[in-house]
Amino acid sequence: MAAVGAEARGAWCVPCLVSLDTLQELCRKEKLTCKSIGITKRNLNNYEVEYLCDYKVVKDMEYYLVKWKGWPDSTNTWEPLQNLKCPLLLQQFSNDKHNYLSQVKKGKAITPKNNNKTLKPAIAEYIVKKAKQRIALQRWQDELNRRKNHKGMIFVENTVDLEGPPSDFYYINEYKPAPGISLVNEATFGCSCTDCFFQKCCPAEAGVLLAYNKNQQIKIPPGTPIYECNSRCQCGPDCPNRIVQKGTQYSLCIFRTSNGRGWGVKTLVKIKRMSFVMEYVGEVITSEEAERRGQFYDNKGITYLFDLDYESDEFTVDAARYGNVSHFVNHSCDPNLQVFNVFIDNLDTRLPRIALFSTRTINAGEELTFDYQMKGSGDISSDSIDHSPAKKRVRTVCKCGAVTCRGYLN
């Protein structure tokens, strides 16, 4: 259960001292509603099917074991098919059954004989696990959308295995500095332009070109920093030089990959080439701390460290525990996203924001990827990687499948 006031003070929680079933029983006994555990005014005194657990045939009548929403498993009951008005759940039950049978037959789908009177315990157990997984993923999806501060929606999908939400991941929208690191989030100066597209603006003050064209697409080469208008600028929110700060505009889906790469991210809408897609955020730590954590991550076979080496190599972004959708974006040696360094309110060149832009048109349903070796400088040479404190460790085999695959993530 979330601790009181946790939302206001940041992402933290404590373990629940009792089971979900016990909480539901207590709520019903005291006539209390609690949406987070499924107790609502609608089902406080009524019964609503949450999912179907099992199946049997008795005297030629079909029965399903029903889990009632907001009620503990001890109240599950067998109900005749004719009494069930939940076609979607019935279809889901059937799909899960066939998926399980396909898996045990190594991909060869089979149709169970009509004279089967009961389900095998292993099938029923799998169906219940899938139902509980869907509920957990839906709750996680709802939480992600409550925490995000951008326009694009976040969806979660797993049709591959029984993996549920990550147990130790907290969604954030901006950098989270580690103790001892200070982030300046207020610019010292801003422009007074009436039209930032044509007038000398923040990029010119920094000695670089305006990063975007009139279609909000990036026009500068990789390695060139982006300087957007900031909180001290006189221009409004429709300024053509305010793109990254508006956040992700596209609806994205965190999905389970089928080739052993864990979670991935795909777009649900078409993304034009050279468009801003998302920021890479996480905990900002020192490079020394990154080296220490990196040894631990290597043993687990994960890679979430991103060196902020635009001008120096003092800091690293660690998205292992704290991050946004970018935490789940997979590596590819032939990616469709490109890294750029961005400066908005914090102009400290040691601490650029990391933005990911599309390198080409990305169609709806296509997975988003970026090159884990690519930096905001545009450099992907092996020399720059070997000398990076966050990368100078055990090499991880790459599974991107690209024709140009280098064989390793780092």
Swiss-Prot record:
InterPro entries for the chain: Chromo-like_dom_sf, Chromo/chromo_shadow_dom, Chromo_domain, Chromodomain_CS, H3-K9_MeTrfase_SUV39H1/2-like, H3K9_Histone-Lys_N-MTase, Post-SET_dom, Pre-SET_dom
Domain of life of the native organism: Eukaryota
GO BP, sorted A to Z: cell differentiation; cellular response to hypoxia; circadian rhythm; epigenetic programming in the zygotic pronuclei; methylation; negative regulation of DNA-templated transcription; negative regulation of gene expression, epigenetic; negative regulation of transcription by RNA polymerase II
Reaction(s) this enzyme catalyzes, per UniProt: L-lysyl(9)-[histone H3] + 3 S-adenosyl-L-methionine = N(6),N(6),N(6)-trimethyl-L-lysyl(9)-[histone H3] + 3 S-adenosyl-L-homocysteine + 3 H(+)
Domain Pre-SET: 189-247
Positions of modified residues (Phosphoserine): S381, S384, S388
Binding site for Zn(2+) 1: C191, C193, C196, C201, C202
Pfam family, one: Chromo
Listed PROSITE patterns: CHROMO_1, CHROMO_2, POST_SET, PRE_SET, SAM_MT43_SUVAR39_3, SET
Keyword terms: Biological rhythms, Cell cycle, Centromere, Chromatin regulator, Chromosome, Differentiation, Metal-binding, Methyltransferase, Nucleus, Phosphoprotein, Repressor, S-adenosyl-L-methionine, Transcription, Transcription regulation, Transferase, Ubl conjugation, Zinc
Chromo domain mapped to chain residues: 47-105
UniProt GO molecular function: histone H3K9 trimethyltransferase activity; S-adenosyl-L-methionine binding; transcription cis-regulatory region binding; ubiquitin-like ligase-substrate adaptor activity; zinc ion binding
Assigned GO CC terms: chromatin; chromosome, centromeric region; nucleus
Enzyme Commission number(s): 2.1.1.355
Processing and modification events after translation: Ubiquitinated by the DCX(DCAF13) E3 ubiquitin ligase complex, leading to its degradation.
Record's function text: Histone methyltransferase that specifically trimethylates 'Lys-9' of histone H3 using monomethylated H3 'Lys-9' as substrate. H3 'Lys-9' trimethylation represents a specific tag for epigenetic transcriptional repression by recruiting HP1 (CBX1, CBX3 and/or CBX5) proteins to methylated histones. Mainly functions in heterochromatin regions, thereby playing a central role in the establishment of constitutive heterochromatin at pericentric and telomere regions. H3 'Lys-9' trimethylation is also required to direct DNA methylation at pericentric repeats.
Family under the similarity heading: Belongs to the class V-like SAM-binding methyltransferase superfamily. Histone-lysine methyltransferase family. Suvar3-9 subfamily.
Protein name in the entry: Histone-lysine N-methyltransferase SUV39H2
Organism of derivation: Macaca fascicularis
